[in-house]
Amino acid sequence: MDMYQNILVVIDPTTNEQKAFKRAIDLASRIQTAVPDMSVNITAFFSIFDFSYEMTTILSSGERDNMRQMVIDEKQQWLDDVISVNSLQVNNTSANMSQISITSEVVWHNRPYEAIINKIINDKYGLVIKGTHQHDKFKSVVFTPTDWHLLRKCPCPVLLVKEHDWPEQGNILAALNVGSDEAEHLSLNDKITKQAKNIAWLTNANVHLVNSYPGTPVNIAIEIPEFDASEYNSAMQAHHKEAMNKHAENFDIALSNTHVEEGLPEAVIEAVASKIDAELVILGTIGRTGISAALIGNTAEHVIDQLNCDVLALKPEGYISPMAAT
């Protein structure tokens, strides 16, 4: 089974409380418990940039380099202290740390997402974990440009961490597009479900599957009087339920844990996740049609904004980041 042995954690430089780092330690310790001989590497990482250092023309390039390095060194010391404190907090919860290696790095870069993705590509990370920001007065999440770029361009899975715990016997929700017979979607459905089962095995959780299907097109019902909207809707529902049942049986998932609902993907996913109190939603973020395509753009922002749990975003097999060639 797939395991995350090389994890990159995007550090939030605005706080000492690092929920993404703690999630990485928790996940790594669960991997250690499940597979004792497997080592897991965690890198705490973030980029910094101050344009004023680039505009100091009275200094030589060497002096500017030295000033930048002083800032990097200062942030590196802060990062190492934060890692030490957060690691100690996790150690106090009986995490298995025997074969978990923790390193850290601060780089100078004016585009955080580029620094992150370059690091992932160069050092072949299998997972990136990043915390989300919340409004001070509201529970909704601020969807940052870095989040958006990572979802679009990161070659490895992206885990966006919120505040929801991963309890024993919790629920993991896999968002699928079972209504499509395109090879890309079938492969992505399989990949999402396999990841859900892997993480459920590590966390002793239950896997649920969700799929949305479109309702009757209003314009057709108006323009074609003889069109039977009820029959159309029943046929659409039956098609998606049959496909969902087949997929669930292929992965030995109880049919009682499948959810096929009419509506927009963002509405259906949020409703089911809330209903089962999901600790994690796993979804695909690249695709031409259906649920995967709908999760690109504003819909992705809406889904992640509304969900009160972690989100793991996967790419299809064979995906190549547009930054890989740059």
PLM regions and their residue ranges:
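A short acidic, glycine-rich active-site loop
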Residues: 63-77, 228-239
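Short beta-strand elements of ligand-binding domains
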Residues: 129-132, 157-163, 311-315
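Glycine-rich, Arg-bearing micro-motifs that act as flexible, cationic patches
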Residues: 130-149, 280-306
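Small/aliphatic-rich secondary-structure junction motif
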Residues: 1-65, 171-226, 306, 316
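Short, structured interface segments
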Residues: 145-166
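Glycine-rich phosphate/pyrophosphate-binding loop and the adjoining helix
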Residues: 206-253
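Structural beta-alpha unit
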Residues: 1-3, 16, 26, 36, ...
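General small-molecule cofactor/ligand-binding pocket signal
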Residues: 43-45, 101-107, 159, 208-210, ...
